[in-house]
Amino acid sequence: MKALLDLFKQVSQDEQFDAIKIGIASPEKIRSWSFGEVRKPETINYRTFKPERDGLFCAKIFGPIKDYECLCGKYKRLKHRGVICEKCGVEVTVAKVRRERMGHIELASPVAHIWFLKSLPSRLGMVLDMTLRDIERVLYFEAWCVIEPGMTPLKRGQIMSDDDFLAKTEEYGDDFRALMGAEAVRELLRTIDIDREVETLRGELKATSSEAKIKKISKRLKVLEGFQKSGIKAEWMVMEVLPVLPPDLRPLVPLDGGRFATSDLNDLYRRVINRNNRLKRLLELKAPEIILRNEKRMLQEAVDSLLDNGRRGKAMTGANKRQLKSLADMIKGKSGRFRQNLLGKRVDYSGRSVIVVGPQLKLHQCGLPKLMALELFKPFIFNRLEMMGLATTIKAAKKLVESQEPVVWDILEEVIREHPVMLNRAPTLHRLGIQAFEPVLIEGKAIQLHPLVCAAFNADFDGDQMAVHVPLSLEAQLEARTLMLASNNVLFPANGEPSIVPSQDIVLGLYYTTRERINGKGEGIFFADVSEVQRAYDNGEVELQTRITVRLTEYERDEQGEWQPVKHRHETTVGRALLSEILPKGLPFTVLNKALKKKEISRLINQSFRRCGLRDTVIFADKLMQSGFRLATRGGISIAMEDMLIPKAKEGILAEASREVKEIDKQYSSGLVTSQERYNNVVDIWGKAGDKVGKAMMEQLATEPVVNRHGEEVRQESFNSIYMMADSGARGSAAQIRQLAGMRGLMAKPDGSIIETPITANFREGLNVLQYFISTHGARKGLADTALKTANSGYLTRRLVDVTQDLVITEDDCGTSHGYAMKALVEGGEVIEPLRDRILGRVAAIDVVNPDTQETAIAAGTLLDEDLVDLIDRLGVDEVKVRTPLTCETRHGLCAHCYGRDLGRGSHVNVGEAVGVIAAQSIGEPGTQLTMRTFHIGGAASRSALASAVETKSNGTVGFASTMRYVTNAKGERVAISRSGELAIFDDNGRERERHKIPYGATVLVGDGEAVKAGTRLASWDPLTRPIVSEYSGAVRFENIEEGVTVAKQVDEVTGLSTLVVITPKTRGGKIVMRPQIKLVNENGEDVKIAGTDHSVNISFPVGALITVRDGQQVAVGEVLARIPQESQKTRDITGGLPRVAELFEARSPKDAGMLAEVTGTVSFGKDTKGKQRLVITDLEGVSHEFLILKEKQVLVHDGQVVNKGEMIVDGPADPHDILRLQGIEKLATYIVDEVQDVYRLQGVKINDKHIEVIVRQMLRRVNIVDPGDTEFIPGEQVERSELLNENDRVVAEDKRPASYDNVLLGITKASLSTDSFISAASFQETTRVLTEAAIMGKRDDLRGLKENVIVGRLIPAGTGLAYHIARKDKEALEAAEREAARQLANPFEDAPVTVGGEPEAPAADTPSDDSAE
């Protein structure tokens, strides 16, 4: 025992390990951990408070209570270390061992481990191939189980009830053996021959073809192979020995008043011991079977609730009826071991306080209250006091500090100098939520924060608190300074925009200064330089906004790269001239020579960063802030009631709207419109009226009349305070001003529907009681929404971080030339995101070629920065193939070239950057800004969306996309017959400017290659009906068109015209009526054939179509045969905001998903079933594929149409899994990126595409084995992509067949749980299931990701930690090689190790180089 302990001691010093392995403990293993058996349920003696011997807190088993002191007090002090007292049997050692020494309980009857029984799918059930219900009946003594059938016809593992058992015993006597309880299960497990089972199963797999069977067999096979590979015996799932947790981990604490607080585990252990002891006694007494059975069942239940209380049956409860916390509850959930103690620890040397604004600070500084600093830097102060000889001991130093002697403050100043501290504001949503600052000591108790970093922390000064942490070691200080100092983090990692942008007062001050006023005092004066302007301003000769001309000095670089002053004359204003003083060298004055709004200032800082570098930008931003504050104070801008100008036109607009509403009401009462239409119209009218009032108000606010110096009256931009605040972007928006001075407009009910009577008043006029009451709904809903949103957004971020946490840049270049071709993003003919924004900061995958000269303009592998992107713009290249994280070929992690620019630093990404976590934070951080609601599109909203034509927005040449197909009709019009036709407009350089979708049946008004001017109509169509157009000419022949059966005649009351409407066919007497269709016949009476085939043209009509041709009528190409009214489309609910993002990342299939064509081929319709129509696609080989489609679904294709694989054939939202299967990874990535971006763009949030791509890469990291070839995999098994590629490489190297596979798209939760690392998965969700599975497979965690390393308490393999881990591995390899060399030298005649395939044999398990820790 003692030898074992020494071994333990030595391990604890030098914790070098490379992996952690998990398995099932064998009874021998448990006994070897144990320091003695716990025999009694007693805990401590109630009088002496000493632990009882052999009890749950026994000192003999677990170690002494006090350091170096045995229980009876015979041996005390250090000199007796290691002695075992002969009186009380306690070893004299540190009391800390009570945290690590375990005991054990010898169970009188075996007990099944509940995790392997009840954690679904039941592992016991899988191994034994029995149902959970049957195993439970055996375990809880309700049934017998046959162990050895002997010569009888019974089967092994057969279940029989008591009566059956008695009958069979009478019949066969002792020929067979049957048991019940855990003994039976253990016997079954012990006698199972795993190797033979595996072989049988593999044989069955090859033989069977039924899907369900394959699935079942491969699941069982996986579990059995797990046992086989890991060397874990199946019978260990049934326990004979129960380990006992060290007592200090389940403490018993005396409270005052003689009561005790105890851990629930002690209760649970006590029950187990009591029942176990009772069972032992009953066995000795040879008690009747029925009593024993009952006692064994109770023991099983007691152990169950100790391991996982409440998993089976009713949970055990304590005295106060609350469920006891079992071992499983200790580790899972938010307050379990993983999330509470391992992933989130509280740290020393930290404090928190309220923050106040510190405008006098520099960007890298923060104000730290003296008292706080004194406490935080104590150890450093003690050290300095001792070095200076002012204190001899730590105690003396402590006294000095506590009495706050004057010398202490001087020392504090010294200690703090250049020692950065880290400030953190919760919630820390992205990496800018923790930044380092140099502390400046201040009086008072509040931390001072620099105003410009508030945006990054999302902090304001209404009572926010922040925490301070002190980095202690030199390395930590170094990293805090170089990587985390606020002045080094001036860009948002999400989009590369500056994060130190001025806001509010600063913006207002700068805006007010840089505005111009017509006819200001001293207008038109010429000044020689800025100092002259300053003098004139100080003497009151000019005002801030006066327009003047001034000569300014700017700096430009000459050939040598030196700054040369250049003088220019500028027409500008006084304020702008004064501001020009703070411009950094290298920025021209033109960037300042305009009214500075928030967006302009952001652009200014961005330009400064790109042109002048980090240092100058930080200084510039600081100066901008100081000027802004000063000038805002000088400006004295304030708000008065008079500033809210109510537009004069308001009354007229309201009167007109009321009149229109009355008109609609009249129509409704006379029955012309339905109530729904009336409601939609009313809402629409008021909505428009509200917008009109708002517009009139803004027009009135925006300008004011002034007299210029020539005495003419002109209008200039207004100096109205409210308008200036909104216009500059300092505070408020047009919508808010509209509520102050226009009208509040329409309000929503709690259920989201709009109340049709609007609030016509504004806040200046005041609301009446009804109006006030209506407004309360919206306000309350807003608050409730916010609370929900925060929780949901936090959970999304957690899942995202978990799925990407192990993605780190691990190498510089993977050498791939794959990538995605990036184009400008065009929607509805408008460029939403230009090409330059999409490729900025990426690496070119192939050479970018100048389209005019065909020369290489930019070589492959170049990082595209601002200058190169400008060049691409100038060259007119409209498509660039760039590297992307999705095509990166690095096995573990990503390479720097595929990722491109690190957005938060503005330069090439470094090896070791944790790009996964950054991506997750960038997507999760704006989550709280997204909406939570589902939009009902319909009613008023969708009417305006019915476009009926497209027009060009720019001059250029028309180009038809390859998908565009059309026919020319008799009038010479082009009629589109493609479902996904697109038109593009190209400019003179041949660059695509815009792209428009042309619906089926539209009249195309321009030709391919035609030059058009802006505003030209390209195509028009009827938005309310969808036509069916003939692609061939001939005479119409009706088929199955019978009045009253498949069609009905409709007569229009007004015009008297009759049309045929297709109705759902009535089946008469079991005769199945085919769908109504027409064929075309040529002059000879033969069917017209589809070009190039021998299919005849037949056009079938869906229900609801209006047939516009007559039987026998001649039709020409492009003529309309029928119309389908479009309002039949139901209004679809569109999921918006946060739920939509979550839905995309969870890869959920939408409920009415559209259907994509599985193959390329020709469409035809087969026989319909009752509720479904049968669609057949005949592929190019002539094989037909059938699909059944619900009748109410809208089919987008018609008979004889040729469709491409992956084209949408039934309308509905797309299913990402289908896109992946039929169109491949690139299309899927584009789909997810675009859809996620749509949600964020709606809220005005910018996120770089590559963050979303990184997440998609992680969602695609597993593959499905189709054919295992000569590999070890099982068909249908899901494995890590990297594992599969490695295995395939190995097999190919041996000239065998590699495995073939399909890509699998996993949602983020699924992907997190299916990672290689069981530690990471267990700490995320479903802890029990993950650990159970890992234990059976005997999994080994190589600690690759960040999370696993945090949990085991090592440096994470990212950033500086990556270098540390690489160096450590290299050093270990070197040492191993040196040891080997030394051994070779020592005995030169020993044979070299046998090598197989060029690799030395793995060392035996007991050699020290096996680095796995149990």
From Swiss-Prot:
Cofactor entry: Mg(2+); Zn(2+)
A cellular-component GO term for this protein: DNA-directed RNA polymerase complex
InterPro entries documented for this protein: DNA-dir_RpoC_beta_prime, DNA-dir_RpoC_beta_prime_bact, RNA_pol_asu, RNA_pol_N, RNA_pol_Rpb1_1, RNA_pol_Rpb1_3, RNA_pol_Rpb1_3_sf, RNA_pol_Rpb1_4
UniProt cross-references to SUPFAM superfamilies, sorted A to Z: beta and beta-prime subunits of DNA dependent RNA-polymerase
Cofactor note: Binds 1 Mg(2+) ion per subunit.
Biological process terms in GO annotation: DNA-templated transcription
Keywords for this protein: DNA-directed RNA polymerase, Magnesium, Metal-binding, Nucleotidyltransferase, Transcription, Transferase, Zinc
Residue segments, region Disordered: 1378-1414
Residues engaged in binding Zn(2+) 1: C70, C72, C85, C88
Enzyme class, UniProt record, top EC level: transferase
One Pfam family matching this protein: RNA_pol_Rpb1_5
Enzyme Commission numbers on file: 2.7.7.6
GO MF term set: DNA binding; DNA-directed RNA polymerase activity; magnesium ion binding; zinc ion binding
Catalyzed chemical reaction(s): RNA(n) + a ribonucleoside 5'-triphosphate = RNA(n+1) + diphosphate
Binding, Mg(2+): D460, D462, D464
Residues the record lists as binding Zn(2+) 2: C814, C888, C895, C898
SMART domains in UniProt: RPOLA_N
Function as written in the Swiss-Prot or TrEMBL entry: DNA-dependent RNA polymerase catalyzes the transcription of DNA into RNA using the four ribonucleoside triphosphates as substrates.
Family from the record: Belongs to the RNA polymerase beta' chain family.
PANTHER family noted in UniProt: DNA-DIRECTED RNA POLYMERASE, DNA-DIRECTED RNA POLYMERASE SUBUNIT BETA
Subunit structure: The RNAP catalytic core consists of 2 alpha, 1 beta, 1 beta' and 1 omega subunit. When a sigma factor is associated with the core the holoenzyme is formed, which can initiate transcription.
Protein name: DNA-directed RNA polymerase subunit beta'
UniProt gene name: rpoC
